[in-house]
Amino acid sequence: MGIKTLIWLSILVVGIYCEISDEDAPVHYCFVNPPPKTRLSPNLLQNITTCTHLVYGSIPIDRDTGYPQYSVSDVESGYDIDNIRTFMRLRKYHPNAKLLMGVVRTKPFEDAATSVKVANGLRSHVKSKRFDGLFVTFNGIHLEYRASTSFLETISKDKKMSLTFGVTGRRVFAFDALRRLQEINDLVEYIYLDMGELPSNEELARVTHINPLFYNGSIPFEETIQGTVEELSKEGILPSRIVVGLTAGGWKFEIKETQDPLKISHGQYAENNGKRVSYQDACRARGAVIYDWQTMNEITVYRQTWMSVNLPTIKAMGEKMKWILGQKFAGIGISHALFDDPRGDCGTDPLPAHRLVMELIRNTIPANPAKCTRLCYLDPEEVEETFPIDNLKSDYCSHIVVPYFALDLSDKMIEEDKAEDLVKKIDDWRSKIVEVAPRLILSVGSKQASTIWQFLLGNDFHRKELAEGLVKAINSTNADGLEISWTSQPMVSDFDKKNLKSFINDIVAADTAKMVEIVVATSQQSAYSDFYDYEHLNKTASLIVLHSHRLHSDSLPFTGHPSPLRATSSMTNQKMSWESLLSHWVEKRVLPSKLVLSLSASTLSMQSLADVRSSAATPFGQSAFVSMLRSKKGDIHSQQEICESLKSGTGVTHWVDGAEVPYLRRYDQMVAYENTRSAHIKAVWASMEGVGGLALHNMHQDDPSAVCDNRTAFPILNALSRAQVCQTCLKQHDFKKCEQHDFVVSCNFELKRSTPVFKTDIVPYERCTEVVVEQATLTLGGNVNFNDVQQEQVVKNLTSLRSKMVKCGMVLSLSCGDSEKYLNSILGDNMTFAIGNVMNIMEKYKFSGVQLDCEKVIRRGNHIYFNTFVKKLAQKFESGKASNGCNRTLSARFSHYTQKPSTYYSVSLLNRLSHIALRMTDKHSVDLPFFFNHTKPEFPSTEKFVNIWKNVGLKPDKLVLELSPFGWQTGKKVGEKKKMTQGVNCVTAGNRAVYEHDYETLTGMTKHENGTINMPMIEDFRYKIGYIQREQLGGIALNVNGDDYTGICGRGSFPILKSVYSSHKCR
């Protein structure tokens, strides 16, 4: 047979190179698998610019040396073809893509040692060929054995090598496959789910649809894309770890003469084995065409031929792709290019399926809704055409506000310059994330002088005409609302106040359909002059935006900051702070939930009268040139310019305590600005105050191209979205009912001698969904014992309260000992006896549940024992009710020391438990930092470990965060800490001690004669509960021994626990 030479037509497409650099963007796997003796075209995938992973071949690796078994055309041979070398030239067109060698192992590994040997040999060879990594597939029963994990584990040790594991839908449901995939999940970059082969394909003569999306009556649910990925998700393999592989072309079957081709269905037997057909062959097939809207496939029937084809159009294969992207899978793959009409024989552009993926990925932005109210302002006069709006994450903004209408004396209103173009750009971006797109608000009058406002609003006819025109204009666009912004200059009289009120009423009257959201922007000058009708705004405006980002101006003859949190002593006007402005509006009885506080991504540059670059003088209140008397040529305007000044060493940044803001000194220039730290603090403070939302003005200055760290676009918005929470009021549960609680409040009660005053009869069970009693121990032989007689007596006392606790759970915390060998002995030889003893002690002391606290003794050697123990114990629990008549509960407790949960635990099993408690404390029982620190990524934090557990597949509503009420007093030695309860703190520092709040550590700090005390405050707990609600976690756990259970602090007993349900700042 001679050499086949395939000459691909040049693909003439005008387009912009799309670099997939966003870590959240979908990946695109592109496969090239040329048959033997076929020459690969070097420009085959030249214009498919979204390929992030290029995979060559499906090369056998059945030799135990690991050396790939190449075909005659893979590498240079007598045929003068070296397709691998040609493939490597694709790097020219895809400089950011990873080039992977595709390998397949059919022969099972004899043992783990063989798998390691094969892996090492293969890894060395792949490096010699200069591939970036491997795409590994097993064609056989390999997933039944752990040697397959050893093979991938050995390859994964090379951190420079990219590794993808491919598994077909057919193999997912094989024996032990899901367990093996859980182990593999942490070893690879992605798991590639190839839906080209299904369980039905075990018998090649069975009629099979190609990549069916949904169940259609004849297709088993587990053979659909939806069913397969749901099974993986249940086992803790999240969509974000899965690339869904689709197939170019389809399946072709010759059916029996006795069968009606129009009535044939998935799973029936054909006359002969099915054949895979390329799209270029399928598109030329004759016959009747039927479209199946469940499988999203085209069915072609001609005589006794039946064919299921992936039709590469937006309404067919595109629906599968849109579903995959909409479900937030890691990405899509198409196998393979040579089956995807590479020459355009079907009359369309070549590679139609690949082009469809490219189009959808380019038009897809990973979409999540904003979890709190955040207004993002873009000024059409300031925003350049190249503004990278696609870098804006969908959850950063709940509203986008554009100054759109200018007021005009003759025409009433006109469009701002470039406003229409900007709105079109925003609309295009919103169309990519339709379901969770931010609301679009068009602003009127933000740049007009008060005289124009007074003229138009002072005349009843002009005012009503303006209101009707604005509502009509809003309804003619895709906008959702209108912002009324009389803010460029302040109002000057009560007439202005009256006319603004009438104008709002006219807009409400003109909006007969009640579709226009009304936002009112306010200035600090008008507010402090009481030129707003506060009661009227409370009733009519959905949001009231305070211009708290304009509290200082460069037109003033002294230095200052546009948005200090609090006033400093040197500030000329003590009212010009966030704290004072918010207090003013709240004192006027405006609902805090309606108020939006503003900050800006832009800077305020001022020129001091002397060179104060190295001066330690108070930064605010110094004499400065007013803006009209100085040149602004060298001013810093944006976040990226701040970064450039700091990197070059021309500027030095300083921090102002109290005001909680930074400023930069550059010779005689002072630049006041916001950074991620100040934005974080403002977001936490505003959240604690129950403020309705935050607004970021001049968003285009917030480093939209990630110049500062080459990682985070819009860093201030990112900081706001991470730190802002929106508290909703928690309804106290009814402890007299056995209902499933939406929010768990787990009260941990310690059995120890150090708290003799804590009598069992004051345990606040009515405020707890469960009381967790700490702690009994599982001992050798499978017995359950308390540490001493006194502890057991305390348990007996609690049991006597059981009737009063009614349906409130009483849960036994059960330790598994102190060593791995200890647990091995218990569960290896006495598991059944241990389970029986757990049930006996529950019955004896009327416990309704058990919380397993076994983390420190779980290792690779015994984790299977533990998972089996949990599974059998859960089955026992399900067989009956607890002593209080409710379902028994089984939970588990872990800490930040478990950094790879899926290595030791069955995530699917944990998802079936009542909940998982996360203990995030140090050795002093003090909470670890709450937020992840990007500068110290190795440092533990609550945010980091919540994400770790969510990323391995634990359901968010199963996660219960333990919040510590303990604080600490600094000791005499460096680093020494003395743990303190809330009550001891009040005794030590006194009830009247004043605490300085730290919005980063979420503690209060006070100094007294014996040292410094740091204590978590009630506001901190309320904030953390807001975070838990925002992330839709399961609830909180609180050690009630650390709360002020005696009421010595003057706020009644258990003030922290009671604050869970009572706060005037929630909504």
Swiss-Prot record:
Pfam families: Glyco_hydro_18. Disulfide bonds join C30-C51, C376-C397, C747-C768. It comes from the Eukaryota. InterPro entries: Chitinase_II/V-like_cat, Chitinase_insertion_sf, Glyco_hydro18_cat, Glycoside_hydrolase_SF, Glycosyl_Hydrlase_18. Residues 1-18 form the signal peptide. It is found in: Secreted. One of its GO terms (molecular function) is chitin binding. GO terms for cellular component: extracellular region. GO terms for biological process: chitin catabolic process; polysaccharide catabolic process. It is an enzyme of class 3 (hydrolase). The active site is at E855 (proton donor). Keywords: Carbohydrate metabolism, Chitin degradation, Disulfide bond, Glycoprotein, Glycosidase, Hydrolase, Polysaccharide degradation, Secreted, Signal. Its main location: secreted. Glycans are attached at N47, N216, N475, N538, N710, N797, N830, N887, N933, N1010. SUPFAM superfamilies: (Trans)glycosidases (SSF51445). Its EC number is 3.2.1.-. Residues 26-364, 372-727, 743-1067 form the GH18 domain. Putative chitinase. Belongs to the glycosyl hydrolase 18 family. This is Chitinase-like protein C25A8.4. It comes from Caenorhabditis elegans. The gene is cht-3.
